[in-house]
C-alpha cells in the first residue's frame, strides 16, 4: 500500500476510536482522506513542535516506523523527519489529483479552505505552495470587524462547492472577533451501484438497535454474486459492494452478535483491516443481501478530538508555530470544522443492454444471507489508491 494511503487508513482508525469514546450509541461518519488533506495544508506552514505533533497525529511517520525493529524499539527510534515534508506534500498532490479525477461513475465534491485574520498576512511562498500541492487558496479575512459576515460567506462557498449538499457548515457563534485562523473541510459523495437494488424490493423492516429496542427502516434487498470475507475474532462478516466501474467500493463489517459492535471497534487495527479486506480473504458468494437505506450528515468541531489525540500546540496561542505560514508569531488555529454527507439508496447503474449477464456456463457459488439489521461498521474506499474516503458506524436509524 502507498505510504500516504496507509497513513490515512491508520489515522481513520485512531480518529474513529477517539470519536467513539464520547459517542456511545451514536452514528459516526467522517472522511479521513478529506480531514488528512485539509490538515496537510496547515502542516505545510507548521514548524517545530507544532509540526511534529501534526505529523504524529496524521501518521505521516508510519512508513518509517514500519521499517524498524520490535514494537518498543519502534517507539524509541521513531523520528519525524520534517525534511520529508516536501515529499509528503507531493504525495498529497498526486493522491488528490487521482481521487478527484473527473468521472461520470460517481460524484465526489470537496471544499477545503483556510481563513486567516488579515492582520496576520500569509507568506507568498506558502500561498504558492498550497495552490500547487492542494489546489487551494488561503484567504485573508476581517474576523475582527466582520466575523459573522465572513461566516456567512464561507458557508455560501462550501454550499456551492458541494452542489448544495453541505449547508451551514459554520453554525451561529462559531467564529467571532477573536478568531485568528480556521480550517473548513466538507465532502459530498454520491455513487451508483454496479448492481442496483430494485426499488420495488425495498420494504419496511425492523433494525435492532439492542436487545430491547428496534426502529423501522426501509430495507433494500438484492440477490447477487458479491465478495464476502469472514472475521474470526471477534466473529463478524464483511461484504464489498462495488460502485459503477469499480473505482470505489462500500465495505460493511457486520458483527455476528447483536451487541458485538464495541468488540469489533476495539479489535480493529490497520493491519487487521488490510488483512480482512485483501483479495486473498475475499470469496464470491451468491448473497441474499438486506441493507438499510439511509442518509448520514455529520458535523464535527475537530479541535477537542485532535487535541486529545496529541495535536494540541496548533490550537494554543502561546505555543503554536506557524512561522512557515506567516511572519506574525502568535498565529494559531482557532478551530477546524468538518461536515460530510452520504446517501445509501437503491440507485445503481443505468444498465446498458447485457449488463450483469454472463456468457458460457454459470458457476455455482455457495449461498449466504447477509442481513444488515443491527449496528455495523462501514467504509467507502477509493480502490486504485486504497484510500479510505469515508469511515463510519451505523447504530441507529
Swiss-Prot record:
Chief location bin: nucleus
Subcellular compartments: Nucleus; Cytoplasm
Alphabetical keyword list: Cytoplasm, Nucleus, Protease inhibitor, Serine protease inhibitor
SUPFAM superfamilies: Serpins (SSF56574)
CDD domains: serpinB10_bomapin (cd19569)
Keyword Ribonucleoprotein: no
GO MF annotation list: serine-type endopeptidase inhibitor activity
GO terms for cellular component: cytoplasm; extracellular space; nucleus
Motif (Nuclear localization signal): 74-77
Cysteine-cysteine disulfides: none
Keyword Electron transport: no
InterPro entries: Serpin_CS, Serpin_dom, Serpin_fam, Serpin_sf, Serpin_sf_1, Serpin_sf_2
Marked site positions, Reactive bond: 362-363
A Pfam family assignment: Serpin
Domain of life: Eukaryota
Family membership: Belongs to the serpin family. Ov-serpin subfamily.
Function of the protein: Protease inhibitor that may play a role in the regulation of protease activities during hematopoiesis and apoptosis induced by TNF. May regulate protease activities in the cytoplasm and in the nucleus.
Protein's name according to its UniProt entry: Serpin B10
Organism, scientific name: Otolemur garnettii (Small-eared galago)
Source species taxonomy: Eukaryota, Metazoa, Chordata, Craniata, Vertebrata
Amino acid at each position: 500500500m502507498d505510504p500516504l494511503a496507509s497513513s490515512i487508513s491508520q489515522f481513520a482508525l485512531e480518529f474513529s476510536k477517539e470519536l467513539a469514546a464520547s459517542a456511545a450509541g451514536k452514528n459516526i461518519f467522517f472522511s479521513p482522506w478529506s480531514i488528512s488533506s485539509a490538515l496537510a495544508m496547515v502542516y505545510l506552514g507548521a514548524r517545530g513542535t507544532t509540526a511534529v505533533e501534526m505529523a504524529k497525529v496524521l501518521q505521516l511517520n508510519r512508513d518509517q516506523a514500519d521499517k524498524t525493529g520490535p514494537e518498543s524499539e519502534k517507539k524509541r527510534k521513531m523520528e519525524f523527519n520534517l525534511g520529508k515534508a516536501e515529499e509528503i506534500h507531493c504525495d498529497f498532490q498526486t493522491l488528490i489529483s487521482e481521487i478527484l479525477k473527473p468521472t461520470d461513475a460517481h460524484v465526489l465534491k470537496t471544499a477545503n479552505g483556510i481563513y486567516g485574520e488579515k492582520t496576520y498576512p500569509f507568506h507568498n511562498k506558502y500561498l504558492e505552495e498550497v495552490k500547487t500541492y492542494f489546489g487551494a487558496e488561503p484567504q485573508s479575512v476581517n474576523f475582527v470587524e466582520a466575523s459573522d459576515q465572513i461566516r456567512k460567506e464561507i458557508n455560501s462557498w462550501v454550499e456551492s462547492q458541494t452542489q448544495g449538499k453541505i449547508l451551514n457548515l459554520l453554525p451561529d457563534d462559531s467564529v467571532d472577533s477573536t478568531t485568528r485562523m480556521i480550517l473548513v473541510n466538507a465532502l459530498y459523495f454520491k455513487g451508483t451501484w454496479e448492481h442496483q437494488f430494485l426499488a420495488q424490493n425495498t420494504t419496511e423492516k425492523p433494525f435492532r438497535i439492542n436487545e430491547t429496542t428496534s426502529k423501522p427502516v426501509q430495507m433494500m434487498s438484492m440477490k447477487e454474486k458479491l465478495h464476502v470475507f469472514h472475521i474470526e475474532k471477534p466473529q463478524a462478516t464483511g461484504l464489498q459492494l462495488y460502485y459503477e466501474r469499480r473505482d470505489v467500493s462500500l465495505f460493511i463489517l457486520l458483527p455476528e452478535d447483536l451487541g458485538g459492535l464495541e468488540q469489533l471497534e476495539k479489535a480493529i487495527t490497520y493491519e487487521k483491516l488490510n488483512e480482512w479486506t485483501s483479495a486473498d480473504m475475499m470469496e464470491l458468494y451468491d448473497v441474499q443481501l438486506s441493507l438499510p437505506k439511509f442518509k448520514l450528515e455529520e458535523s464535527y468541531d475537530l479541535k477537542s478530538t485532535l487535541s486529545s489525540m496529541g495535536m494540541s500546540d496548533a490550537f494554543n496561542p502561546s505555543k503554536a508555530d506557524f512561522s512557515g505560514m506567516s511572519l506574525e508569531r502568535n498565529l494559531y488555529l482557532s478551530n477546524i470544522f468538518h461536515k460530510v454527507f452520504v446517501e445509501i439508496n437503491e440507485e445503481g447503474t443505468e444498465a446498458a443492454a447485457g449488463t450483469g449477464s454472463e456468457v458460457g456456463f454459470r458457476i455455482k457459488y455457495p449461498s449466504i444471507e447477509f442481513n444488515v439489521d443491527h449496528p455495523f461498521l462501514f467504509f467507502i474506499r477509493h480502490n486504485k489508491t486504497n484510500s479510505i474516503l469515508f469511515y463510519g458506524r451505523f447504530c441507529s436509524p
